[in-house]
A protein has these predicted regions:
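Metal-dependent amide/peptide-bond hydrolase catalytic core
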Residues: 30-32, 253-445
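Boundary at the C-terminal end of the N-terminal hydrophobic targeting segment
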Residues: 25-29
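Bacterial N-terminal signal peptides that target proteins for export
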Residues: 1-14
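Divalent metal-coordination and catalytic microenvironments
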Residues: 56, 95, 107, 146, ...
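Bacterial N-terminal signal peptides
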Residues: 12-23
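Histidine/acidic-residue-rich, glycine-tolerant segments that coordinate divalent metal ions
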Residues: 94, 129-141, 147-148, 160-282, ...
Length: 445
């Protein structure tokens, strides 16, 4: 076939794909608008929820510094009749509403924002500053949607408090600090989240999603988010004059050889059916062109689902670094510091299926769609690792037409990211109410 005909064919196929995506996205968006009608209280709440969202968006706070944010939410849920305990795990909140016998169901949101300068141009854009862990003053913005999550969490709390005749058991609301540093969930658990308070039977959380049309729930049973390890490596050499390399042991050359070897760990030592990522994100070494330095520092991130894959990758990194140092006759083996982050998120398959069925019954057959797993991390995993049946779901947050256009859109952690507030917020609240109502049922005798 001539090249021009092939190109025409490709363009035609691409057009069909985009038209199909647009039609599907618009169908999802129409359904998202209709689903909120099944919860009539939402319409009356919308002005207050929008005001809360804009307030939270304009006043972001960094991990473990979310004092204003926590106070705002605690005051609101306390007014709804929840028993509120503040300061759990630092700035975290636990709010309980007991409503007769039944299961304990936890709904978690995140409090913290990111050290990013917002560039959205919104009238309520953040101009906030904060102090990071190194003591540096940095701009702060909600570039990951935690402001949306908190607003939906509160809206859900308000509707559930009004609908006590529709559910039974204990609703446990958790507002967690420091998700962005992967330390908040562990801090709350260490402070007695599941011992000072009731250990839940189920735990739920939702996150905004830039790959789905606004208002559509995304789900994935089984492994959904990857574990995280940060690896800090220092390679030692023997510095000297750049014109006399024979008198030195060059750590830059050792690092270069190690980098190439490390990149084969995933491609040649890991089962292709077991997802894994090794990224070397930073290299620091040397000062000027004619001096060979004494050392080079490298920073890596390692992601995987399976703990056995994780352990093998970390062991392989050490093996390759040690081997390259020995081959170069380095004065000492590299220093390797591994900082474990979040464990992998595992969505309980049976619970996922139950929640998806409830969403499709209550909000329509297209209200929930399956989505791929991700290699990003989330410390929501800590609650599942503590023995609670847990599910993390996503909520589409991008205008369907923009998504179907094929143009590159801002992603999470971008200074340009913000969700399409409606119908995303309405759908977020509706989905959480439907799922909580599904799980909070009276025991049968």
């Amino acid at each position: 076939m001539p090249c021009n005909e092939i190109e025409v064919g490709r363009r035609y196929a691409l057009l069909l794909i985009l038209l199909s995506l647009a039609a599907s996205a618009n169908a999802h968006a129409d359904e998202a608008k209709n689903l909120a009608q099944s919860i009539p209280e939402l319409s009356a709440l919308e002005p207050d929820l929008e005001a809360l969202y804009k307030d939270l968006h304009a006043h972001p706070e960094l991990a473990f510094h979310e004092t204003r944010t926590a106070e705002t939410l605690a005051k609101r849920v306390r007014a709804l009749g929840f028993e509120v305990t503040a300061g759990v795990g630092g700035t975290g909140i636990v709010a309980l509403m007991h409503n007769g016998p039944g299961p304990v169901v936890m709904l978690r949101t995140e409090l913290d924002a990111l050290p990013i300068e917002e560039k959205t141009g919104l009238s309520f854009a953040s101009k906030a500053k904060g102090v990071n862990a190194e003591g540096t003053v940095v701009p702060v913005a909600h570039a990951c949607g935690h402001d949306l999550h908190m607003t939906g969490w509160y809206g859900t709390a308000e509707i559930m408090s009004r609908r006590r005749n529709a559910w039974h058991g204990t609703l446990m609301l958790v507002a967690q600090p420091a998700e962005e540093t992967n330390r908040g969930a562990a801090a709350m658990l260490a402070d007695g989240l599941f011992t000072r308070f009731q250990k839940p039977d189920f735990a739920l959380s939702m996150h905004d999603e830039p790959s789905l049309p606004s208002g559509v729930v995304g789900f994935h049973a089984g492994f959904f988010r990857a574990s995280l390890d940060s690896v800090d490596v220092t390679i030692y050499g023997r510095g000297g004059h750049g014109a006399k390399p024979q008198m030195t042991v060059d750590p830059i050359v050792i690092a270069a050889r190690a980098i190439l070897g490390i990149q084969t760990i995933v491609s040649r030592e890991t089962d292709p059916l077991s997802p894994a990522v090794v990224t070397i994100g930073a290299i620091h070494g040397g000062t000027v062109s004619n001096i060979i330095p004494d050392e080079v520092r490298m920073l890596m991130t390692v992601r995987s689902y399976d703990h056995r894959v994780r352990e093998r990758i970390l062991a392989s990194i050490k093996r390759q670094l040690d081997a390259e140092a020995a081959a170069a006759d380095a004065p000492s083996l590299p220093s390797i510091k591994i900082e474990p982050g979040a464990e992998s998120v595992y969505n309980d398959p049976e619970l996922t299926a139950r929640l998806v069925a409830a969403l499709r019954r209550g909000l329509g057959p297209d209200s929930a769609v399956e989505m791929p797993a991700k290699m990003t991390s989330e410390d929501f995993s800590a609650y599942g690792r503590a023995g609670v049946r847990a599910v993390l779901l996503h909520i589409g947050a991008v205008n369907p037409a923009a998504l179907a256009s094929g143009t590159k859109l801002p992603d999470l952690h971008s200074p340009l990211w913000y969700p399409e507030l409606e119908p995303t917020l309405r759908s977020l609240v509706a989905a959480e109410v439907v799922m909580l109502t599904e799980l909070l049922v009276a025991p049968s005798f």
